Amino acid sequence: MNTMTLTPGQLSLSQLYDVWRHPVQLRLDASAIDGINASVACVNDIVAEGRTAYGINTGFGLLAQTRIADEDLQNLQRSLVLSHAAGVGDPLDDAMVRLIMVLKINSLARGFSGIRLSVIEALIALVNAGVYPLIPAKGSVGASGDLAPLAHLSLTLLGEGKARWQGEWLPAQAALKKAGLEPVALAAKEGLALLNGTQASTAFALRGLFEAQELFASAVVCGALTTEAVLGSCRPFDARIHAARGQQGQIDVARLFRHLLTDTSAIAESHHHCHKVQDPYSLRCQPQVMGACLTQLRQTKEVLLAEANAVSDNPLVFAEAGEVISGGNFHAEPVAMAADNLALAIAEIGALSERRITLMMDKHMSQLPPFLVKNGGVNSGFMIAQVTAAALASENKALAHPHSVDSLPTSANQEDHVSMAPAAGRRLWEMAANTRGVIAVEWLAACQGIDLREGLTSSPLLEQARQTLRERVAHYTQDRFFAPDIECATTLLAQGALQRLVPDFM
């Protein structure tokens, strides 16, 4: 099991990916402890001195002007968690819950939240024991933070709600007991610190980014395979073309294609002196389109990595000055916009792949048998597989609609502009699945096209991509049940079968 020492505010993208993919044993770096304790001392001083501070001894949202008596402060925090656990929908899977918890721990341990070390350690214990709170997928608008999802997370700390332990849903009390853990009682400010924050939104978008990276790499490999299958030219990937424009994403994508499409390709050599002047845009403009997508991925990474290491609580405790200041770091607009931009990239990756599939279907454009099968008429070949790809690509056009431009006021207009970041991030998962299906069809089609080149081989890396598929999916000599082949290719893509052929591009 992966062991990770958490230095608050310094999580890397690779660490976040590992948290998403695998269970982790988490340890808090000792350097965080003084800051955590100082923020708690500041909160305690405010309570002891009778000063009024939002979230410490007041109500919440529109009820912020209501002063809460000292004897009710513990009950205030517990009531907050219980009342805000109002999410709906299917439970998030363990990987997403684990990522949300680690993001929450990272934020709280920065020392601006006024939450005791013992509560942070209780969250770490949940992660390490594999106790995963039941968090419904829906119910947050991404301001004031992800209140409902984080309330469901916090329920388990209190011994309320349900949690999954070793694959079994249990009452939270029972799950804690089996894991050898105890519920906690929350002190002043702690319930609000747990609930306020953008951790669910950020986790949703991070998953979208992780999947988009795999899709991008897979699409570049399949685009290179298709270029070979239809006897496309390598000249559009010449470094001089892309240097003249100066778009870094485009320059880097062209380099990836040159890495894949080498001079050792017998296919490329076979038509080196052919009469064709230019290829269709879906081949020739791959660096331009995929380069723009890569730029979006990189910008999304920058925003999400900053947010993953951010303090998005409210109010914030500035212990050195002895102040608690209300602000709006819980507003997930940066995450929503990043997710919207990522949606455009995922949609375009799939759209370009679908165009290349269609190109291979047309015998006049591809110089291959219609629908990539011999004895056409008796055999339909890839005819309907292309239709499936078109359906998936078209779905993504609707799903790419921006969420960050939407807003509905909540909390009796106290929270009158919200980000819709959770929905912006969550739809990326469906879009990624659609695009993966499109790329799977292209992989199948491109390998079939190369097979039909009568023994000619491609470059070593592309032959490796073809061999990986052919170990699981046979060449089509005649029609057969097609869906299992798409499913097989999709699974291989999700496992990174093609991604590992591409050098790091982020």
UniProtKB/Swiss-Prot annotation:
Gene3D superfamilies: Fumarase/aspartase (Central domain), Fumarase/aspartase (N-terminal domain)
Primary location class: cytoplasm
Catalytic reaction equation(s): L-histidine = trans-urocanate + NH4(+)
GO MF annotations in UniProt: histidine ammonia-lyase activity
Record EC number: 4.3.1.3
Residues the record lists as 2,3-didehydroalanine (Ser) modifications: S144
Keywords, comma-separated and alphabetical: Cytoplasm, Histidine metabolism, Lyase
Localization per Swiss-Prot or TrEMBL: Cytoplasm
NCBIfam families: hutH, PRK09367.1
Pfam families (alphabetical): Lyase_aromatic (PF00221)
InterPro entries: Aromatic_Lyase (IPR001106), Fumarase/histidase_N (IPR024083), HutH (IPR005921), L-Aspartase-like (IPR008948), Phe/His_NH3-lyase_AS (IPR022313)
Record family assignment: Belongs to the PAL/histidase family.
Species per Swiss-Prot/TrEMBL record: Salmonella typhi
Superkingdom to which the source organism belongs: Bacteria
Any GO CC annotation of this UniProt entry: cytoplasm
PANTHER family per the UniProt record, alphabetical: HISTIDINE AMMONIA-LYASE
GO BP, one annotated term: L-histidine catabolic process to glutamate and formate
Protein name: Histidine ammonia-lyase
